[in-house]
Amino acid sequence: MFVNRGYMRPIKPLRVNIQDYDVIAVGTPTWWYTMTPAVKTFLHNENWKGKEVIPFMTNGGWPGHVIKDMKKACTEASFFDEKQIQFDFTGGSELVTPQKEIENWITNIKNNIW
C-alpha cells in the first residue's frame, strides 16, 4: 500500500470554490496512521491562506498522526477545535467516543464559529 509512503491520489476538481468560504471542516478516516490519499491531495492542492480549518478524523483505536499531518498540509490556515472520533478496533461501527462528547464538540463549533 502506498499510503504510508505519502501517495497522493488524483482527484476530480471540486464543484465549489473553497475561496468562497472562511471556515472549512475537513474529515478523514485513518489509513496507515495518516489521512487518506484523496484527502491528502485535496489539502495539498488548495490555498489555505486566511482559512479557519476544523480538522477531524475517525479511527479504530490507532489515531496515528492524522491531525498533525492535516495541519502540516494546510499551510497558512488557522485551526479550530480538532476532533478524533474513535470506533471499535475490530473495524466495526460501534462508536467508542461518547456521543455526548461529539455533540459538545459540534455545539462548541456552532457557538464559536457561526
Feature annotation, model-predicted:
Residues M1-W114:
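FMN-binding flavodoxin-like domain, especially the glycine-rich phosphate-binding loop
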